[in-house]
From Swiss-Prot:
This is Probable phosphoglucosamine mutase. Keywords: Isomerase, Magnesium, Metal-binding, Phosphoprotein. One of its GO terms (molecular function) is phosphomannomutase activity. Activated by phosphorylation. The gene is glmM. Its EC number is 5.4.2.10. GO terms for biological process: carbohydrate metabolic process. Mg(2+) binds at residues 91, 229, 231, 233. Signal peptide: none annotated. PANTHER family: PHOSPHOMANNOMUTASE (PTHR43771:SF1). Its cofactor is Mg(2+). Gene3D superfamilies: Alpha-D-Glucose-1,6-Bisphosphate, subunit A, domain 3, Alpha-D-phosphohexomutase, C-terminal domain. Catalyzes the conversion of glucosamine-6-phosphate to glucosamine-1-phosphate.
Length: 434
């Protein structure tokens, strides 16, 4: 039984992720943990899944503390006082999706071994149902957001920048506007009222979805703009000229400021630009599978200073192994206080990148990748820890099945003629899909 993808359990509500499944996850988790903290993002289905999880946890004898609607990094930080954390979220996915993500007390998402243990236990119904006098207690804690803010404010310097913030009607609305104000910023908010229908824009904070933010940054003459996804584990940015800052650019900028003159180790996924390697020359760059849990595992394994994903997940191990879009927003304020974001971008090497995605049923992904590997292997050095990445003379290409959606993704990067590399991979994928 395979339930976990690259970002926990996730799927369409009442089809792939149901109250029955949530109940089973709760029973298995509650059979192995004595205490748990649970939170949720604003999506419409989140309370239903949360109730089912709480029922399962308490039925197995686990005491549960509910922190309400919070961001994923807030929940992961709250988990430090419990044996585990449970977050109901589908992150950047649309309204019809819901998911469950599990956290260890150090802010690390459940690793592969822990995920497999839960999958096996559900399949074999290996869980407890305690007697009435041992049922777990349910409590509420309203301090999780304040605690997270206090942590960040103790690490980041104040600034008087003007910032436009687009929370995308997600959970970031509960914390980021207030945090930046307390750090001295003048904050202009967009879509900062939680709404699980995500009426303003798609929750994913990519270039295509942030047209309003880009216009607002210019109109209000702001120093830069910030955007979150549905649960604010992600953070993306727009410079003062209204230009979207790519994930690879932010990854490199954060890496430079975290490493400083000491260099160090930085962990990134296989789909990361070679720009990061060149800009962080002298630092060791470790590549992992795509997914924040794998990046976090790499950070822990190699004792890295920092790690992140171009999708907008930034992990700062000095505070947590959870991607923290809230801390990243505050950290970027501190960085831009010293130099404009457009000037920082101008320092970066520029390579052409092209990305695309094609529908592919989950059950057909393995067969597809075998066909793709056969075609790509003769072309160059292969890294196959997650999909197939081939190093070419002029760049590289990665073909990788999505861990959260029924898609296969292509990423190509080159010093020149990126279209040729992309189209070559596209042709191979399309033929394999027939």
């Amino acid at each position: 039984m395979k339930l976990f993808g690259s970002s926990g359990i996730r799927g369409i509500v009442n089809k792939e992720v149901t109250p029955e499944l949530a109940l089973q996850v709760g029973l298995v988790l509650g059979s192995r943990k004595k205490t748990a903290v649970i939170g949720r993002d604003p999506r419409v289905s989140a309370p239903m899944i949360e109730h089912a999880l709480v029922a399962g946890l308490t039925a197995a004898g686990c005491d549960v503390t509910k922190v309400g609607m919070v961001t994923t990094p807030t929940l992961a930080y709250a988990a430090r006082e419990y044996e585990c954390g449970v977050m109901v979220t589908a992150s950047h996915n649309p309204s019809e999706y819901v998911g469950i993500k599990l956290w260890n007390p150090d802010g690390m998402a459940f690793d592969s071994a822990q995920q497999e243990e839960i999958e096996d236990a559900i399949e074999n119904e290996n869980f407890l149902r305690v007697t009435w006098d041992l049922i777990g207690k349910v409590a509420e804690n309203g301090n999780a957001i304040r605690d997270h803010m206090d942590l960040i404010e103790g690490l980041v310097r104040d600034s008087k920048l003007r910032v436009v913030l687009d929370c995308g009607c997600g959970a970031g609305s509960t914390i980021t506007p207030y945090l930046l104000q307390e750090l001295g910023c003048q904050v202009i908010t967009l879509n900062s009222q939680p709404d699980g229908h995500f009426p303003a824009r798609n929750p994913e904070p990519n270039d295509q979805n942030l047209s309003l933010l880009k216009k607002a940054v210019v109109a209000f003459e702001a120093d830069f703009g910030i955007a979150h996804d549905g649960d604010a584990d992600r953070m993306m940015a727009v410079d003062e000229k209204g230009n979207f800052v790519s994930g690879d650019e932010l990854l490199a900028i954060f890496g430079r400021f975290e490493c400083g003159d000491e260099k160090g180790t930085v962990v990134v996924p296989v789909d990361t630009s070679m720009m990061v390697d060149d800009y962080l020359e002298g630092s060791e760059i470790i590549r992992t599978r795509v997914g924040d849990v794998y990046v976090a595992e790499g950070i822990k394994q190699y004792g890295a200073i920092y790690g992140g994903e171009p999708s907008g997940s930034w992990i700062f191990p000095k505070i947590s192994y959870c991607p923290d879009g809230i801390y990243a927003a505050a950290k970027l304020v501190e960085i831009v206080r010293e130099k404009k974001l457009s000037e920082l971008r101008a320092e970066l090497p520029v390579y052409a990148t092209k990305r695309g995605a094609f529908p592919c049923a989950n059950e057909k992904k393995a067969e597809l990748m075998e066909k793709v590997k056969t075609k790509l292997e003769p072309l160059g050095k292969v890294l196959d820890i997650d999909g197939i990445r081939v190093e070419l003379e002029n760049g590289w290409v990665l073909v990788r099945p999505s861990g959260t959606e029924a898609k296969v993704r292509i990423t190509a990067e080159a010093r020149e003629k990126v279209d040729e590399i992309y189209e070559m991979a596209e042709k191979i994928v399309k033929e394999a899909l027939k």
